[in-house]
UniProtKB/Swiss-Prot annotation:
This is Transcriptional regulator protein FixT. Prevents transcription of the intermediate key regulatory genes nifA and fixK by counteracting the activity of the FixLJ two-component system. Acts as an inhibitor of the sensor hemoprotein kinase fixL, preventing the production or the accumulation of its phosphorylated form. It comes from the Bacteria. The gene is fixT. It comes from Rhizobium meliloti (strain 1021). Keywords: Plasmid, Repressor, Transcription, Transcription regulation. Interacts directly with FixL.
Length: 115
């Protein structure tokens, strides 16, 4: 069951999903990981936020763009720094590679902004 401490991780790369989930679980967050936006939709409704890797934008461009805009500011897009994305409107970005502290900083700012 999802609660306010659950974070959804969406990435095609299993290693990235595991790494992000591990970093969050060490800090006391619950995580659910998915390899596609469609599989994560139902879980995201009650989650604290969603973390989406930018590779999903290449494999599911329309679904991922809609997914990010529907999170109401509760999404983080992981970008590789070379991605030519338009400036985010409804989500935060975090450039890869990043540290656990970087990730937690972005999550904390989303939580503060949501209050």
């Amino acid at each position: 069951m999802l609660d306010g401490k659950t974070i959804i991780v969406v990435a095609a790369d299993q290693g990235l999903r595991r790494s992000v989930a591990f970093a969050l679980e060490v800090e006391g967050y619950y995580t659910e990981s998915y390899d596609s936006v469609q599989k994560s939709e139902a879980s995201c409704r009650e989650a604290l936020c969603a973390i989406v890797d930018d590779d999903i934008l290449r494999t599911e461009p329309q679904a991922a763009a809609q997914f990010l805009s529907n999170r109401g500011g509760r999404a983080i897009l992981l970008v590789d720094g070379l991605s030519a994305l338009q400036p985010p409107v409804d989500y935060a970005t975090l450039t890869k590679p990043f540290t656990g502290a970087d990730l937690l900083g972005v999550i904390n700012s989303l939580v503060v902004a949501a209050k």
